[in-house]
C-alpha cells in the first residue's frame, strides 16, 4: 500500500495532477543530487518517488502557485 495515502496527500495539495508534478520534480532532484530533506532512516519508502511524497506530506515541500 502507498504511504502516505493519496487521501492524506490531497489534503496538502489541491489536485492529484499537481501532486504527480511536484513528486516527479522532487524525486528527480533527489536522484540527481542525492540531497534529502530528512535523514535516510526517517523515510518509510526506499525509492525517491515515495520519499518525495513523504516530504510533501510532512510539509517540507511548499507549493507556490503562479498567476497566469
Where are these regions (language model features)?
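Polar low-complexity intrinsically disordered regions
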Residues: 1-68
Amino acid at each position: 500500500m502507498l504511504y502516505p495515502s493519496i487521501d492524506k496527500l490531497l489534503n496538502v495539495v489541491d489536485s492529484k495532477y499537481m501532486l504527480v508534478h511536484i513528486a516527479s520534480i522532487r524525486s528527480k532532484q533527489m536522484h540527481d543530487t542525492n540531497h534529502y530533506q530528512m535523514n535516510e532512516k526517517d523515510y518509510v519508502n526506499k525509492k525517491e518517488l515515495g520519499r518525495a511524497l513523504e516530504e510533501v506530506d510532512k510539509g517540507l515541500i511548499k507549493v507556490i502557485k503562479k498567476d497566469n
